[in-house]
Amino acid sequence: MRQVTIPLIQSKSMFCVIYRSSKRDQTYLYVEKKDDFSRVPDALMKGFGQPQLAMMLPLDGRKKLVNAELEKVKQALSEQGYYLQLPPPPEDLLKQHLSSVGQNTSHADR
């Protein structure tokens, strides 16, 4: 009887390691492997400062991330080896207030 070997198909789980910037508040760098910044441009690393480990997490089976789009993160990690998460733009509370006041005044004029 002939023995047949079936190759094992290993699914490579996608993990990422997230580092916090020491220079910029609310700025995070996602890389594929812990302490491997070899694919991150030198200029970016200089501006980022000393990376501070924030967390490691699996991306497979995950539906979303808190402050980043999951598919963009996966694509960036695959294509360029890193993903940079910048802080959200600051809220312009004065503009929001003036806008709501303007809307309320226009309703009062009717």
Swiss-Prot record:
Residues 88-110 are annotated as: Disordered. Residues 14-98 form the YcgL domain. It comes from the Bacteria. InterPro entries: YcgL-like_sf, YcgL_dom. Signal peptide: none annotated. Residues 97-110 have a biased composition (Polar residues). HAMAP family: UPF0745 (MF_01866). This is Protein YcgL. The gene is ycgL.
